């Protein structure tokens, strides 16, 4: 399916994305043997819970789930590859099978999509290659006693993402989907890897990006505001940006409004089925969720709508009627000024006049700082650095 057709449809109507994969896998009540199959019968360690492996050992289950979402009205469905990267697969000592899993996932999804479109000539279906954030962060230390330590490097992430994207593209996906992004540095490595792979393979696939926010303050888990995040990825070639996971649809609207106002991209939203209960499951009914999603559609905030944790084909089945005849979101214009990002956005406009970034912590630019360093007065020098940090745009 070509990129031009996808973009044309985004301008014409609101597209429907599928719902939760893990939720549906749980409904099959699979055991350890299901995850192992004959191929991995003697593989050391427990494999139950490695859902991505089911693309090899129980492809029938994964294809059944994909078809259920298509029957519910989904225009786009994601491959079962959220954790299919070498970094995450290390938990199961299955790094060597990453390419095979992604290739199998792409191929079985391609088969489902092509078969379904042959059976339903009036439907256009897109396969999105799902790429999760990995289980490590490049921006923060997992050790509070060693804040400079990083459990993963940018190069590690780039290599892991590159291998995954290669498998998905070779498997026949239509879209590259980075989802549940919580660390900007992680996804920047992924976006770079994706663009390199697509260039090497001479493919022009659309790239979608979806992030997750903290319920407290609406920031990414690495601390950025939405606008700072947009500034951080403005150099990339994504076609859409959006929100998924995080919380339920009831709490997502103000952040979608901010994206819709400022993001020069198409907008996606696929919230959880409410918030998890004390047992870790989700109780929001399909009708209740549709009620919360309705304003996204009516106010022109989205181009793509779907579901994340706790959602099922029953939830997605409410969307076709909801989006029928609705006008899709029109992307905002690109910023007319310089956008810089830290934890918050810095807009550099003519009316800002001169923006003084600071030279007080430079031995070549500050005699006082030079003297303190020469004298070994590091605590006083650190005080200057702290004052600059407090005054700086975050």
Stretch-by-stretch model annotation:
Residues 1-394:
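Domain-level signal for soluble alpha/beta catalytic cores
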């Amino acid at each position: 399916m070509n990129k031009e057709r996808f973009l044309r449809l985004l301008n014409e109507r609101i597209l429907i994305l599928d719902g939760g994969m893990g939720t549906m896998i749980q409904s099959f009540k699979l055991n350890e043997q299901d995850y192992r199959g004959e191929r991995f019968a003697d593989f050391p360690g427990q494999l139950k819970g490695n859902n991505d492996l089911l693309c090899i050992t129980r492809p029938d289950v994964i294809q059944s789930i994909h078809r259920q979402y298509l029957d519910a009205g989904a225009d786009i469905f994601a491959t079962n590859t959220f954790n299919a990267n070498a970094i995450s697969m290390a938990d199961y000592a299955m790094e060597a099978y990453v390419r095979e899993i992604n290739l199998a996932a792409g191929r079985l999804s391609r088969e489902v999509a092509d078969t379904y479109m042959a059976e339903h000539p009036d439907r256009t279906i897109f396969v999105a290659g799902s790429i999760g954030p990995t289980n490590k962060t490049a921006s923060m230390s997992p050790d509070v006693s060693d804040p400079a330590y990083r459990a993963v490097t940018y190069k590690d992430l780039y290599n892991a993402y590159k291998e995954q994207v290669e498998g998905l593209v070779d498997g026949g996906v239509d879209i590259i989907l980075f989802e549940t992004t919580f660390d900007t540095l992680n996804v920047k490595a992924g976006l770079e890897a994706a663009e390199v792979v697509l260039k090497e393979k001479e493919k022009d696939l659309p790239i979608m990006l979806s992030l997750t926010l903290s319920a407290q303050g609406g920031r990414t888990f690495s601390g950025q505001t939405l606008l700072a995040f947009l500034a951080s990825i403005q150099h990339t070639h994504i076609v859409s940006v959006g929100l998924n996971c995080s919380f339920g649809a009831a709490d997502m609207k103000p952040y979608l409004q901010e994206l819709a106002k400022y993001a020069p991209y198409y907008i996606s939203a696929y919230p959880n089925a409410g918030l998890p209960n004390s047992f870790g499951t989700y109780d929001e009914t399909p009708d209740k969720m549709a009620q919360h999603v309705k304003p996204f559609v009516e106010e022109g905030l989205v181009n793509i709508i779907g579901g994340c944790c706790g959602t099922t084909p029953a939830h997605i089945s409410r969307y076709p009627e909801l989006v029928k005849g609705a006008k899709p979101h029109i992307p905002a214009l690109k910023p007319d000024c310089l956008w810089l990002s830290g934890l918050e956005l810095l807009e550099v406009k003519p009316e800002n006049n001169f923006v003084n970034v600071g030279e007080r912590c430079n031995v070549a630019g500050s005699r006082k700082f030079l003297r303190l360093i020469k004298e070994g007065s590091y605590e006083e020098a650190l005080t200057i650095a702290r004052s600059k940090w407090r005054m700086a745009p975050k």
